[in-house]
Structures are given as C-alpha cells and as structure tokens.
Amino acid sequence: MIISSYHLLAPRCRRDQKVYNKSIHVLNTVAKGIKGWPFLGSAPALAAVDTNGIIGIFKSWAEQYGSITQFSAMGDKQVILTEDKDARELFVRRGIKYSDRGAPHAVEYISMKQNPGFRPKDDGWRRQRSMIQSAINITSINKYQSLMDDEATFTVNALLQSPDSFHGEFLRYSYSVLTSSLLGFSVRSPSDPFIHHNETFTAELMNSFRPDCFPSNVFPVLRKLPMWLLPSLRTMERLRKEYVGEMWAFRRKIEKLVKEGSATECIYKHFLLHRDQYNVTEEESVHTFQAMIDGGTRSPHNNLLTFLFLMMEFPEWQKKLQEEVDRVVGRDRMPSYRDIPNLPTVRAIVKETVRYRSIVAEMGIGHCLQTDDIYKGYFFEKGTVFNAIFASILMDKDTYPDGKLFNPARWLEPSYPTYKEPLTTYPNCQGFPAFGYGRRACPGVDFAERTLVIMFAKLGWTMNIRWPRDEDGNELREELQYEPVPAPRPLKFGCRLEARDADRAKIVEEAAKHLKLQ
C-alpha cells in the first residue's frame, strides 16, 4: 500500500539515444526572469529546496507556462500536469504507455528497485501488485474489519485517559490496524520498539527523495564517486543494508512462528501457508510486505492529525459530524462499520480531509513514458517523467469552485459538480486523484479509507475537539504546517480533546475493557 508518495528529478526510464527537436514549451527559467543553466537546466534550483518548496516552484511554472509545462534537469525531460483531465487521459486511458517509474537514484539504490511503489513496470512489479491486491481483499472480510473497529475503540479510550497524547496514539493506531491484520500482532504503545525502529528508518528513507539531502538524485556524476568522498553515498549504503537486513529478519521470525504453530492468524501467515498460490519470488515478497507496512501506516496517521486540526479550524463541520452520528447511531453505543453507509457526512469529511491535505502538502508519484507519444499536438519523448500536481488538480476551479476552502458540502449537495448519488455509497475515495492514477494508483485506498472512516465516526461520537487555551481562557490558534518530505506529516500542534459527556466516556471505557486484541 503505497499511499500518496513523491517522485522528483528521476532519470529517464529505458530511454534510447534518439534525439527529437519537436517538443512542447521548454522551460528555461526556474522563476520569472531567471534562466536555466546550460545542460544543467533547472536542476540547481530544484536541488536547493525541499518538497514544499518544489511544489511551490511547480505551481508557479504552471501558472506562467500553462497546464502542461515541460522542463529539463541534467538533460532529462519532465512534465508538470495541473489538470485532472490531462492526468486521466495520459495515466488512465493511455496507461499502458505511462505506467513506468524512474525513481530518484537514492531511492532506487536503497530499495534495490524492488519496492513496488517505485519499481519499473516489469513482470516483477506485476507480481507484487497482484500480491498486494490479494492482501487488501483479505482485509475486507468481517474478521479484519472487526480488528479495525477494536483498534479504533482502544485508541479513543486511550485519548479519553490521556487527551494530550493524540500525536502518539494516532501513530500507534495507524500501525496497529495494519500489524494486527498483516503481521499478526497489535502494538499497545506509541513507544513500542517496532514503531520506534520503523519510524526512525522511514524518516531517513523519506529523505532519500530530497535532492538537497542526496545530490546524486540530480547530479549523476556524483554517483561515480567513492563512498568515502561523499557522505550521502555512505548513508545510502547504510540504509540499504538496514532495509534488507530488517526485512529478512522479520520474515525469518514469522516463518519460525508458523513452523512452531504459534503464529497468530494474519495475512503474512496466510501467505506462507499458501505460498504456492503466489508467483512472486522470495525477494519480491519481503519487499512487498515492507512496502505495505511503510505506505499503510504513514497516510492514515497524516490524515488523522489533519482531521483534528480541521475540526478545530472549522467547528461547524465538527458539529455536523456529531449531529449525524448522534442521529444514526444514538447515545447508547459507539458507531460501527454497519453504520458507515448511513454516515455520508462522515465519509465526506474523510474525503475532504484527504483533498485538503493533498493540496497543501503532497505531489503525485511521477509516471515515466515508455514510448514516444503525441498529446494535444505536443510530442513527448520516451523516458519523459510526468508529474501530476495535486496542489493544482484538486483546486481546479471548474471541479472545486471554492477549492481553497475546507468544504465537505461539495460531496453532499447537488449544487456542486463533485456530488454523486446514492449517498449510501458516495462520497468515497475510490478513483480519487489524491491516491494516484491508473495502474500506479494506490492499491490500498480501500484499506486506508476504512481505517479513517471508523475513527472519524468514533471520535465525533465521543469527543469535542477544540483549540487549547491559555491561563486567561484565550484560544491558542496555530497554522497547519507539514514536514518537508514526501507523504509529510503535520508538525506538532496543540489540541484540546474532551468527552462530550460522562455517559459516552463510560460506554467507551466499558467497551475497551472487553476488547480481545492480539
């Protein structure tokens, strides 16, 4: 489950040496009045900024040059797409041509081109994708949905006991809903060694996308230097060894438990017991499980934190959420998955939270063109990398008339172009651009949506979400800011969580006592 990652300045994929002169507007400036360097193109400017800065640069270029803008970096061509219709035409309808990858050098080196999110479109990638889809299908059965429901109840109860711990508890929840179904164990504390170790490594891995941290991503000549001469190359080698070592160590641990008969029911156990049903290689399988862990934990955590902030910033929507869950569920029990079809406002807030976060802090994963193509009269050379810019796509004026505003009503009211019926099914996140396009769309969107919707519903039923106050009773408002990395998390902010009433708190506490978590 590679949920909404980031691609930047990657080498052209499987290109030949043929050179073409016909092309779209070639961007020679990194900003108005500044020319790109000969051969280097825009690489120096892009290498000097972090992810958030690059999103801003791409948006400004698109505003200056149009919805399809081409630039070069070290001779490699890249294209910026800022309209959904163009992204769907190329990535979906012409997906057979536009589904390759050309990951940044550091990412390819560390993952050895085996991570299915960044791997080139080859037979191995197809096998891995099939394996991921099988895993997602397994999690949709009632048994695993019950695990998600229980994990959400555990988390809400923990927040009632320790309201200031929401950053850590949401992190624990994001891990535990995945580990309980995928790996066969729950994590009961944000300080669990599994979380700590994986978070430490993932933080370093996310930096491997950044050209300011790994200059070999944009300057190929640096890849030829000896490791002792360039610290970032030594870091890449260390991360590669850790990445491989941890994956195989965990695999051996699960195999041992299965052999002893003590392994808990989970997807990893199912895979090992039914190995003949999967045609992935052993190496592909361990990389696939690691990719599901990395992608499946980061996105829910990011969106849960964003949700809290938005409920403080837009209290009218918190009130609407609470009114809906009260009307549908009542006061005597917490929401469950059987209520979800009757909670369109909850689902609308989930989808709008994902949209809102994506427009301020996310880019699409680059799609690499596998063969020459012509679109809208423009010629594109094989190996060109196309970047869908969510900050523009999800604010398209025709589709999102008030795009800068957090407004879940756009999914609920017929006056908006995004409205769909029936409301027992819509809104949902299937096919939503924030999760990618075509063959490279996130295969875990359904899992991610189920993880979020049950938690949003339970939080709305149980708690009031408010700005913290100082000793004089004044609200301590903040601006929402994100990390400068791919799939960024919100930076630390304050929030005041309180039970809506004592009866609800008691119901949650009693339910938590009877949980049978793994």
Curated annotation (Swiss-Prot):
Its EC number is 1.-.-.-. Pathway: Secondary metabolite biosynthesis. Induction: Expression is induced under hypoxic conditions. Keywords: Heme, Iron, Metal-binding, Monooxygenase, Oxidoreductase. The keyword Transmembrane does not apply. Its cofactor is heme. GO terms for molecular function: heme binding; iron ion binding; monooxygenase activity; oxidoreductase activity, acting on paired donors, with incorporation or reduction of molecular oxygen. Pfam families: p450. Belongs to the cytochrome P450 family. This is Cytochrome P450 monooxygenase psoD. The lineage of its organism: Eukaryota, Fungi, Dikarya, Ascomycota, Pezizomycotina.
